[in-house]
């Protein structure tokens, strides 16, 4: 069964050319935690999603659903 992709953190990091290490340092979290978010193994809290969006300078919705046209 395919794993549900509940967040787009990995994709947005790539779009912004930001490493997971940079995000981990900014949020004072481990790289392992960011990796688990990026692979949708676990989900960050809404508050953490807000912090990620602020750091990446994107609308929080970008982290959940692609708003780009195909």
Identify the function of each model-found stretch:
Residues 47-62:
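DNA major-groove recognition helix of helix-turn-helix/homeodomain DNA-binding modules
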Residues 21, 32, 61:
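Key DNA-contact positions within bacterial/archaeal DNA-binding proteins
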Residues 1-19:
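A short, Lys/Arg-rich alpha-helix, primarily the initiator
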Residues 38, 56, 64-67:
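DNA major-groove recognition helix of helix-turn-helix
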Residues 14, 25, 54:
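Alpha-helical residues within the helix-turn-helix
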Residues 29-44:
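Recognition helix of helix-turn-helix/homeodomain-like DNA-binding domains
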């Amino acid at each position: 069964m395919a794993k549900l992709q509940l967040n787009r953190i990995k994709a947005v990091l790539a779009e912004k050319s930001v490493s997971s290490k940079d995000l981990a340092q900014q949020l004072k979290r481990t790289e392992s935690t960011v990796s688990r978010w990026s692979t949708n193994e676990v989900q960050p809290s809404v508050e953490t999603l807000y912090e990620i969006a602020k750091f990446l300078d994107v609308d929080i919705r970008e982290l959940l659903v692609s708003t780009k046209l195909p």
